[in-house]
Amino acid sequence: MINDEGRIRIYFGSGPFRNMRCEGWKKYILSHVYSRVFNKPSSSFLTHPGPLGANVGELEDDMLTLSSKPKRILSENYGMHSFFEGASIRKVRDKYFFVYSSSLNHELCYAISDYPDRDFKFMGTIISNGDVGYEGRKERDRVNATGTIHGSIEKIGDDWYVFYHRLTGGSDYSRQVCAERIEINEDYHITQVPLTSLGMDSKCLGELPPP
């Protein structure tokens, strides 16, 4: 989705997607899902290369036609922090920030570049919906149920925030929209922030009375 001078445009895939890069049970399940959804034989679901990655394509002025063949913009050599889904790009000063949900599934990571379509360098994790990685915390010590996360960063006034969702009730399908204040240093580094209940408020709202 983009805001094109006041006009909101929403883009979505039509499929079927071929050559998806999966292994094992994921490949088996996805091949049958695409077969049923798009009425195609599961044999059309191949293994390489595929659209499961961070890709970019330049649009013509009609905002529909691709002017060039899509290309992969994010390296797969980020270890456990490789791209999974939820691509979002922002311009911060003279750098492009690519924010995404990593393959760990519970964290928003980011990479930066001088260009919007190439040469991105992995920088780190912005937030985890279980505080995994914050001050060295391991996943076994997570402070909340971990699972699917989406979001991005935005500047409001003079401050930057990360908007994301965390899980409630221990369910991956019960999601609470949240915001945390972040700081982007002169070297474009964002230190991972913890989960709080402050949201966009700058001060603590107080403590709950004892039961």
PLM region spans:
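Carbohydrate-active catalytic/glycan-binding domains of CAZyme proteins
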Residues: M1-P211
